Design a protein with these regions (language model features):
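Positively charged, low-complexity intrinsically disordered leader regions
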Residues: 1-52, 56
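Phosphate/diphosphate ligand-binding glycine-rich loop within oxidoreductases
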Residues: 34-41, 47-156
Length: 156
């Protein structure tokens, strides 16, 4: 799977739920599946449960994890195209994404709605930029309009 933005991306939901039940029954059954693989989790917004559960799930699969809090401890990133870079943002997201992709095997993105431009929010621009420019599989840890991990958990 190259992209997981919506539970519909899973295909057969019954099969996905069945696999999830199997994994939940034996959390370490696939503990070598992610060996020598790295998950990069990019947070444009704060998180508690999603961050902890996603990181733990990756660890249960034997993956390494890198957490990048874009607004704390990293350069602020400009996400708008065509903006003059004269503000407090030191790097453009389009330049940073390929760099991020070079350090990992899969990327999780958490980027909330800006609530100033409905069309922009619904376009899921940040998420789709990662899809287009990272060269890696990408999944949403919550976006402007969806939270597929939570939606999948709610199906239980």
């Amino acid at each position: 799977m190259k992209s997981f933005l919506n539970v519909k991306d899973l295909g057969d939901l019954k099969e996905a739920l069945s696999e999830a039940v199997e994994i939940k029954a034996d959390r370490y059954k696939y503990d070598t599946l992610g060996k020598n693989k790295t998950l990069l989790m990019v947070f444009f917004n704060n998180s508690l449960r999603t961050r902890l559960s996603t990181q733990k799930a990756a660890m249960n699969l034997g993956m390494n994890t890198i957490v990048l809090d874009v607004n704390a401890g990293a350069w602020k990133l400009e996400t708008e195209r065509g903006v003059i870079m004269d503000g407090d943002k030191s790097e453009h997201l389009l330049e940073a994404i390929p760099v991020m992709g070079s350090f990992c095997d899969v990327i999780g993105i958490r980027s909330f709605a800006g609530l100033t431009d409905r069309d922009y929010d619904y376009a899921e621009t940040v998420y789709h930029q990662f899809e287009q420019y990272s060269g890696k599989p990408v999944f949403a840890m919550e976006t402007a309009t969806v939270h597929p991990l939570q939606a999948f958990a709610d199906l239980f």
